[in-house]
A protein has these predicted regions:
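Alpha-helical cap/lid subdomain in secreted, periplasmic
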Residues: 1-137
């Protein structure tokens, strides 16, 4: 089972700041994520926790900084509960060392095909998927 949550929780703090009831605070986020982990972990073979992400390379950007807070919660809980951490933000940050974020998401939240492929590759790398042993079509 994989859990990736928090992106809209952060986004709502910036796209509808006048409606605070729409926002999920870091404390609420941690409580909710902890509850999901505790209700799931003993029922599955492996539990993957994925960091929320914001496709913005500038860590000083207010929304990126807030997303990093939520990602830190995921990292901490992943370690605490022994879950497999899939760090989507780190994967995107590696991409941003070479390309602009607009290449993978016009709004910095919803990935296009390239962005989704980066996510898939990052997730599969934590599942033991070996790209060197792909079946060859005959």
């Amino acid at each position: 089972v994989s859990i990736c949550t928090g992106i809209n929780d952060v986004w709502r703090q910036f796209d509808v700041p006048g409606i605070p009831s729409e926002a999920c605070t870091p404390d609420e986020y941690e409580h909710n994520l902890r509850e999901m982990i505790e209700r799931t972990r003993d029922k599955v073979l492996r539990l993957f926790l994925a960091t929320p992400y914001f496709m913005e390379p500038c860590r000083a950007d207010r929304m990126r900084a807030r997303m990093d807070e939520y990602s830190d919660i995921v990292r901490r809980l992943s370690s605490e509960y022994g879950c497999e951490l899939v760090d989507f933000q780190a994967a995107y940050d590696r991409f941003f060392e070479h390309k602009h974020s607009a290449i993978i998401a016009w709004d910095r939240v919803h990935p296009n095909q390239i962005g989704a492929t980066l996510m898939a590759r990052e997730f599969l790398s934590h599942c033991g998927f070996d790209y060197g042993h792909m079946p060859v079509e005959k």
